[in-house]
Regions:
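S-adenosylmethionine-dependent methyltransferases
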Residues: 1-228
């Protein structure tokens, strides 16, 4: 797995997330990476290497989690983990994290970044959302900037219905794309609740990231925390 990291020219980005410094090894030139796409692999499933970029939606998710979510001891599933920032921050705050991605190279970088930040309680699993091989329900399901292709909406909702624990919460972060709206309509159609807020982010520019919290009709962990 580490060979996936060594084959690329990389840089390290250091982020301040709440009270912690998080180091993320990333691809030095994302645009150059596109030139080396395998045309056969792309033709099979239009597999662009989105995992290789550190997206603002992931940075906003990391900040949100660190400030808002009671993570210690919780079971966390990350969908489309990419470079692993979100999973690393969750683990640093005491969560037990399963990072999943469709790309082996993404999991290699996520594993590398977990080691770089001395994270424990992190596991990594190659996973196709259409055929999820999961064995438990999770307190939190987290996904950053994955809502852009309609063909994935049904499989993602199925994962939420099957693997989000009662009383648990899913959080999806994205830059406010219009084509994400039907996904959240589908979420509500299947009986889940969804609330949206916008998170201001100053990182490589100014952003307003949409954060969508999804839960079963029962109260969410944040509701319980506020009632204490």
């Amino acid at each position: 797995m580490e060979n996936h990291v060594q084959r690329y020219t990389t840089i390290e980005t250091v982020l301040e997330v709440q009270d912690r410094r998080v180091r993320v090894t990333r691809i030095a030139d994302f645009e150059a990476l596109l030139e080396y796409l395998d045309p056969i692999t792309f033709a099979e499933d239009e597999r662009l290497p989105y995992w290789a970029e550190l997206w603002p939606a992931a940075v906003a998710m990391a900040q949100y989690m660190a400030q808002r979510l009671p993570l210690a001891g919780r079971q966390v599933l990350e969908l489309g983990c990419g470079l692993g920032l979100v999973g690393v921050v969750a683990a640093l705050h005491g969560a037990r994290v399963l990072c999943t991605d469709y790309e082996a190279a993404a999991l290699a970088f996520a594993r590398h970044n977990a080691r770089r930040n001395a994270c424990s309680h992190m596991r990594f699993q190659l996973m196709d959302w259409r055929r999820p091989a999961l064995r438990r329900r999770y307190d939190y399901i987290l996904a950053s900037d994955v809502i852009y292709e309609a063909r994935n909406f049904g499989p993602l909702v199925t994962i939420l219905r099957r693997y989000l624990a009662r009383g648990g919460m899913a959080v999806f972060s994205e830059p406010g794309r219009v084509n994400a709206v039907p996904f959240f309509a589908l979420v509500r159609q299947y009986g889940l609740t969804c609330k949206t807020e916008f998170w201001p982010l100053e990182w490589e520019g100014t952003h307003q990231i949409a954060l969508h919290t999804i839960s079963h009709p029962a109260e969410s962990p944040l509701d319980r925390q506020r009632s204490l």
